Design a protein with these regions (language model features):
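The substrate-binding groove and active-site-proximal loops of carbohydrate-active enzymes
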Residues: 52, 122-130, 153-163
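Active-site neighborhood of glycoside hydrolase catalytic domains
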Residues: 209-252
Length: 414
């Protein structure tokens, strides 16, 4: 990868993160005041503070310490349920210490996708009956990123609403709807839980790949945080849980015939492009057959177009009407067959692991340059870039750079 490529990706990440930062009149800290809020996109498509988007952009290391501390504080003070289960309308529940999907400017937490309502009516179950799994784990990853870049270990003992940050993180890590024997996240078919936010219009059941990978990464991060404050025994326990999850991910989701990982064991038992790439990026799997599957799909044009990544290989759609077995959106739109740059960095790392090539990143940069005046990088595009959405999208700008950083850190040609 040429130095100009790495530099261009960094510049794009900086610019996109800047485009996503808006000054809003908000009440996150007990009073209404003007404060900078990081939104998912530069066109304000989503008018709230999304926990996962912020955490994923933060992985770039490009958010200033003071800003990341503020966002972390917003989640700790406004975005986590208390000790009791909240029972909402239409059979929805918010488990103890669940973390919100997004937090409105008035400081009120919204635990379910598809709505800005923060009261008892947060949906009818079409976005799950428990909050998406992912935000508990992104809360932990956000905290770990802040401590890593700032060196501010003391924040872990700081009080946030009557609990230390460490206590809040540990309760988030325990999670809900977990198969305790395997450590994997599990969704009931009759009252399902959204896997994670970038497939919140997709219904899955059984054990879930992507949520379990996030749980693995969060436990590994929490182990390091425990070590940083001298809690080595507790750190070893969290690391052991991470190892258990990784072992069971490989046992449960890996398809030896193809090298792909399945997205779920029930509804949605399909090859998961994003999840497979993320498993490689997370160090959970490194099988040659898996790397070959990702390379073959890239070279064959079934998983990637212009550096953007599809959730399901295009030649593995569930039917002629839908990429996923169960989705609320039309084929080849949004999360049901469109192409996204959120997974580009993970995929780039996997391709580099296979044959030391990084063409996917240069493809992405070329497309971004061609459509920059139209709002690139986009949230998603179709194959022809005729249908698209989400302008100057935060994770589309930041995560390709994160993949490039990983390649460089492991000795990739820069």
């Amino acid at each position: 990868m040429a130095a100009s490529c790495l530099g261009a990706l960094r510049d794009l990440a900086v610019r996109t993160i800047r485009d996503c930062a808006f000054t809003k009149r908000a009440s996150y800290f007990g009073k209404e005041e003007d404060t900078v809020v990081l939104l998912p996109s530069g066109d304000e498509k989503y008018l709230s503070f999304w926990v996962r988007d912020c955490a994923m952009m933060a992985e770039s290391g490009l958010l200033p310490d003071r800003d990341l501390e503020r966002y972390l504080s917003i989640v700790a003070l406004c975005g986590q349920n208390g000790a009791d289960t909240r029972f909402l309308e239409n059979g929805l529940t918010v488990p103890p210490y669940a973390v919100a999907d997004h937090i409105n400017y008035d400081g009120c937490a919204v635990f379910f996708p598809g709505t800005y309502r923060s009261g008892t009516d947060q949906g009818n179950g079409s976005y799950g009956f428990s909050p998406p799994f992912c935000d508990n784990y992104f809360f932990i990853l956000m905290a770990a990123q802040y401590v890593a870049q700032s060196g501010d270990v003391a924040i872990l003992g700081k009080d946030f609403g009557g609990m230390t940050l460490t206590e809040r993180l540990e309760r988030a890590a325990y999670g809900y709807n977990i198969d305790r024997e395997s450590g994997l996240c599990e969704s009931a078919a009759g009252a399902y839980t959204v896997d994670w936010g970038f497939v919140d219009t997709v219904k899955k059941s059984g054990k879930l790949l992507m949520a379990s990978l996030l749980r693995h990464n969060a436990h590994a991060a929490l182990a390091k945080l425990c070590d940083a404050v001298g809690e080595s025994v507790k750190g070893k326990q969290y690391l052991a849980e991470a190892h258990k999850i990784a072992d069971n991910v490989r046992k449960t989701f890996y398809d030896d015939a193809s090298g792909w990982l399945y997205s779920a064991t029930g509804i949605g038992h399909q090859y998961d492009v994003w999840g497979t790439a993320y498993a490689v990026f997370s160090g959970v799997i490194s099988k040659q057959r898996t790397l070959e599957a990702l390379s073959r799909a890239y070279r064959g044009g079934t998983a990637v177009v212009n550096g953007y990544v599809r959730h399901i290989p295009a030649d593995c759609n569930h039917s002629s009407a839908s990429a996923w077995e169960s989705s609320t959106t039309a084929l080849d739109r949004y999360q049901n067959g469109a192409y996204w740059a959120t997974a580009t960095g993970w995929y780039a790392y996997a391709l580099w692991r296979y044959d030391r090539t990084t063409d996917i990143l240069t493809d992405f940069l070329a497309h971004t340059a061609r459509f920059s005046a139209h709002g690139a990088p986009f949230e998603w595009i179709d194959r022809e870039t005729e249908n698209l959405s989400g302008l100057y999208y935060g994770t589309s700008g930041a995560l390709p750079y994160i993949g490039a950083l990983r390649i460089a850190a492991e000795g990739g040609s820069i």
